[in-house]
A protein has these predicted regions:
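Conserved beta-strand hairpin/beta-sheet module of binuclear metal-dependent hydrolase folds
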Residues: 1-66, 199-224
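Flexible, acidic/histidine-containing loops and adjacent segments that form or flank the divalent-metal
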Residues: 1-4, 81-218, 289-316
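Active-site metal-binding loops of divalent metal-dependent hydrolases
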Residues: 9, 32-36, 76, 101, ...
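Active-site metal-binding motif and surrounding structural segment of the metallo-beta-lactamase
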Residues: 20, 26-29, 35-98, 233-246, ...
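A short, polar/proline- and glycine-enriched secondary-structure boundary/capping micro-motif
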Residues: 40-42, 176-178, 227-232
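Short amphipathic alpha-helical segments and helix-helix/interface helices
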Residues: 57, 84-88, 131-135, 229-230, ...
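Internal alpha/beta domain cores that form substrate/cofactor-binding pockets in large enzymes
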Residues: 79, 106-110, 115-123, 228, ...
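Short, conserved, surface-exposed binding loops centered on an aromatic residue
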Residues: 199, 209-211, 229-231, 254-257
Length: 316
């Protein structure tokens, strides 16, 4: 049985994939680690006592997961990698799959130091520091780090019954990403390059397609619809909607290609930036009534709040 938990990390993504044989865990993978906070400074605080938000590391502990065969990072925004430290405090990892691996001797980036960089450039450094710092501190808890080149689709057989394709954006993005981050770790901090890359992070987001017993699960990361709606996409059973169901996350054209039977939106309730966007939620409901939200999202007349620590799906 394949067990999927789209964890309610509040603002962010973290998805636990497990293959079970009875009560025995055969395989486990975590895709992204959520945010380093259950709330954001620019979002209203959680006032509902029924809130079930949980850090990814704490969710793993609650499920008795002490080891991940694979930890996959889609990209380096704070709401996807901020929880890495808590995850590595909780579990050991067989293999980390990532679009960028910091140099082995890399030190802190000190994004808040007196570096003369604009705020947007500092934010890029801060996100990378939240990723690289735990790798330094807990590197002995990771068996292997594999940097994915991004120039071709990666096809992995995870178990006898479970396979995964890892899909990328434009191939030219990933050498550029490496050049910008490597320069930052060398102390060469070009504000323009950092800001420009910060605007490219979502379009570089990895996507995954899982295959299990004739079912297909698409995990869209933060990839905007226009980046992959022109590609050959086949119908899927479950779609993790890209980019928190923002207005740029999906289109009618993409949904016609994917034809999801169920959709999951990883998003915090009460966001002031229309994520999830009501139009996108309406569009999703045109294709499937089976639309789930990780947090207790409420859109009058469209979505009623549901309080849970994860959207839990089991596939025999």
């Amino acid at each position: 049985m394949l067990v999927l938990d789209f964890i309610n990390v509040g603002n962010g993504d973290s998805i636990l994939v497990r293959e079970m044989e009875g009560e025995r865990l055969r395989f486990s993978m975590l895709v992204d680690c959520g945010h380093d906070s259950l709330e954001r400074d620019d979002h209203p605080p959680v006032e509902d006592p029924r809130s079930c938000r949980i850090f990814a590391g704490d969710f793993l502990r609650s499920q008795g997961v002490a080891h991940l065969d694979i930890l996959l990072v889609t990209h380096f925004h704070r709401d996807h990698i901020g929880g890495l430290g808590r995850v590595l405090e909780t579990v050991t990892v067989g293999e980390l799959l990532t679009p960028y691996a910091p140099p082995a001797d890399s030190g802190p980036l000190d994004p808040d130091g007196d570096n003369g960089l604009p705020k947007a450039a500092r934010n890029v450094l801060r996100c990378m520091d939240l990723y690289a710092g735990p790798l330094r501190r807990y590197g002995d808890r990771i068996g292997r780090i594999k940097e994915l080149p991004g120039d071709r689709m990666e096809c992995l057989r995870l178990t006898d019954d479970l396979t995964m394709d890892i899909l990328f954006g434009e191939p030219a993005l990933y050498p550029r990403q490496k050049a910008v981050y490597d320069a930052a770790f060398r102390g060469e901090r070009n504000g323009y390059d950092l800001i420009h890359w910060g605007k490219s992070m979502n379009v570089s987001s990895l996507r995954q397609r899982l295959y299990y017993h004739g079912r297909e699960i698409v995990l869209g990361g933060d990839a905007y619809a226009h980046m992959w709606e022109t590609q050959t996409a086949t119908p899927c059973d479950i779609l993790k909607v890209p980019h928190h169901a923002s207005l740029s996350s999906t289109t009618r054209k993409l949904l016609r290609l994917l034809q999801p039977k169920a959709a999951v939106v990883c998003v915090a309730a009460g966001r002031p930036d229309e994520r999830p966007h009501p139009y996108i939620v309406s569009l999703l409901k045109e294709f499937t009534e089976d639309v789930h939200f990780t947090d207790a999202v409420e859109i009058p007349g469209l979505v009623e709040p549901v309080f849970h620590t994860s959207v839990h799906i089991e596939l025999p």
